[in-house]
Amino acid sequence: MSAPISPEIDLDYNYEYEKNGPYTKFSDWVPYKLHKWEPKFLEDYYQLYGLKLHYGENELRRNIYFLKTGLKKRFRHPKNALCPVKDEDEYYKYRNLLFMHMNLQIMRSYMRIASQFDKRHLYFYNLDFAYDLNRSFEVADGFYKEAIPYWKEAQKYADRSSEIDSDLDLGTIETERYEIITGKLDFGTIIEDHLSRLEKKRKTVQEYLAQHPDANKPLLEQ
């Protein structure tokens, strides 16, 4: 006589089981397909952009990669745009606004990376690490300069998109365009200011290293 079937669910059998044990889920023997999404259009790569509250260089480089890749892709069909577009003029403005905004985001990402190698203030006791500071400031200088071409591209596309009078429902992107063409938002001046102050700090560090040659090597080797 067979044992009565228990109405209770065998949780150990269904959920807590050993991979190579006597009980194996039938689904483990069934091949399955991973449904993955592959970005194809410029908007797809733009939507991959994101920045957490606490971010580091890796997150910034990831965003730069997605945005740069997106700039080389074609746009979605107008009916799938990120905002309603009523005619060809609005679609022209839409494309230029996205080009402008993505170049701005790349520029900002480069500036954020540069700021991680820069120092807002250089105090006298920081010169104990003059060797490391000198190398760090050199990296910061490179990233600040890397941001400049993307600011110029953003200006170019802001001017082009301003040829169309109608406003698009793209959040603050229209505000960015207006502030760029009116000069209220001028990252060219901001970057120049960062580079100018960085050059003064680099000069201070290099003068210290010239006066203290023994300090021009890693701290552990001094």
Where are these regions (language model features)?
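Short coil/turn linker motifs that delimit alpha-helical repeat modules in TPR/alpha-solenoid proteins
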Residues: E88, R95, M102, F129, ...
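Gram-negative bacterial Sec-dependent N-terminal signal peptides
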Residues: M1-S2
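Amphipathic alpha-helical repeat scaffolds of TPR domains
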Residues: I5-K73, K93-Y125, I164-T204, Y208
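Heptad-repeat coiled-coil alpha-helices
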Residues: R120, K156, R160-E163, Q211-D214
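Acidic, serine/threonine/proline-rich low-complexity intrinsically disordered regions
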Residues: H121-V139
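Short, low-complexity, Pro/Ser/Thr/Gly-rich segments in the mature regions of secreted, periplasmic
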Residues: K201-Q222
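Alpha-helical junction/boundary sensor with strong preference for TPR arrays
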Residues: L67, L71-D89, F117, Y144-A147, ...
